Amino acid sequence: MSKSEQDFTRFVALPDPRFAVEAEERKLCVSGVEFGARYTLTFRAGLPAESGEGLIKETKIEFYVRDRTPKVSFPGRGYILPSSGEASIPVQTVNSEELDLTLRRVSDRNILRVFQDDLFAKPLYRFQAERLAGDIGEEVWSGTGLTESVLNQDSKTRLPISEAIAGQPAGVYVLSASLKSETYRYGTVAQQWFVLTDIGLSSVAGRDGLQALCKNVEAVSACGTA
């Protein structure tokens, strides 16, 4: 495309007035299109090339915008969940209706290794997830999770995990989620870290100093003499 030509709009007939066209190096880009849709663009005669020559005659091109690539992620960095009662964790997906889930417990002595190996609170590549599974975390539950899915849109679902954590001792856990489809099994693995406990700690700073408060997470009441 001609470097001197800045506005290519007059050379392209767009199927929707909301679309925009612009040049990026050797490419002519159309913005505003939707995923999973077909369009027809008409390039008018005279469309300039970098050599200075122009398109001889009007040309129509039909193209298809593919659906979004399936994706899974956890929007939160960490949670404190009660060891009893109902519990769920939000997950965000794109074009996925089912996930493979694995719950692992991380012992106190392995928490430091999680930070040393940069495995905390981030999506992991497969080799990192395998390291977490083999050397650091102990698998305590596995299963599948169903998610809400609207084609090509971000969808958020609350995954119920009451069954997975039932009977588990207090401690640090990580829930791994990966796409069910074999096609995407070599992508990253989403991880959600959380602490399973009945005790919640908070602090308040005032003129009289720092006060530490201890509450029962499930009952939202003070821990008494704790």
Language model features with spans:
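N-terminal, cleavable Sec-dependent signal peptides of secreted/periplasmic/extracellular proteins
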Residues: 1-226
